[in-house]
């Protein structure tokens, strides 16, 4: 996914009220950008970090910029990280259209935001191709506390735990369901940050036990764009250690 307009570079001053970030642009101008990220953003929101913003083309929008990327000093080195949690669903849809997601090859249709379970909406429902429909839940990941190991979540994630329970219900009823973790940075493996949210950890393990599938993909991240790139193993007990290969 290429950014439609060139990103604008700045330096982070502060991130506050979860969804706001003050940034100093290269010319010294201070702007407030929308931060589409409800998480703690551990290790990603230090003052002085180099950031990239996307300018809005909507003249009626209150904030003229959205925070897209941060160049963070993570364990293992400096790298660009995508922090916009609105991007992963679009990245999955793009990879689906390009037949890059091996577990979903053969399906013809990817419908977003389909109601299911008790009171949830699944990110995607795949259908067609003579295959059983598959409920797909997408999670964004940008936490790294050990070199090469991506983790989720970076804060309590009660809603995500409920999603795992709903996916488990789909499989228990005879359907197919999967979790796709989109890691908006380079990493060699994925695991649950169980010390941060043991409830989500238990919910995912229970889902895996009944047959919910789980896959994790890193992304190629840079000023020009973000794209799903490489599958990596999931270290959570009950998940397969063999990553699902991208195709194409």
Curated annotation (Swiss-Prot):
User: InterPro entries under this entry?
Assistant: SfsA, SfsA_C, SfsA_N
Among the Pfam families in the record, one is SfsA
The record's GO molecular-function terms, alphabetically, read: DNA binding
Q: Which Gene3D superfamilies match?
A: 2.40.50.580, 3.40.1350.60
Family stated for the protein in its record: Belongs to the SfsA family.
Q: Which PANTHER family does the record associate with it?
A: SUGAR FERMENTATION STIMULATION PROTEIN A
NCBIfam families (UniProt xref):
sfsA
Recorded protein name is Sugar fermentation stimulation protein homolog
């Amino acid at each position: 996914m290429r950014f439609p307009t060139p990103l604008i570079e700045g330096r982070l001053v502060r991130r506050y009220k979860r969804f706001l970030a003050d940034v100093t642009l290269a010319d010294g101008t201070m702007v407030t950008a929308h931060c589409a990220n409800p998480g703690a953003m551990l290790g990603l929101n230090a003052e002085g970090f180099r950031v990239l913003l996307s300018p809005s083309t909507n003249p009626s929008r209150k904030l003229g910029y959205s925070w897209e990327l941060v160049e963070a000093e993570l364990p293992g080195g400096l790298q660009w990280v995508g922090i916009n949690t609105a991007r992963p669903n679009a990245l999955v849809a793009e990879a689906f259209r390009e037949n890059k997601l091996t577990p979903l090859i053969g399906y013809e249709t990817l419908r977003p935001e389909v109601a299911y379970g008790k009171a949830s909406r699944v990110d995607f429902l795949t259908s067609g191709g003579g295959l059983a429909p598959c409920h797909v839940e997408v999670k964004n990941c940008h936490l790294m506390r050990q070199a090469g190991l991506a983790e989720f979540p970076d804060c309590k994630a009660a809603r995500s735990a409920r999603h795992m329970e709903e996916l488990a219900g789909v499989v228990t009823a005879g359907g197919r369901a999967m979790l796709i973790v989109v890691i908006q940075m380079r990493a060699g493996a994925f695991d649950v940050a169980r010390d941060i949210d043991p409830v989500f950890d238990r919910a995912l393990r229970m889902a895996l036990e009944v047959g919910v599938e789980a896959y994790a993909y890193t992304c190629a991240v840079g000023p020009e764009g973000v794209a799903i790139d490489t599958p990596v193993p999931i270290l959570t007990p009950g998940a397969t250690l063999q990553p699902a290969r991208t195709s194409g």
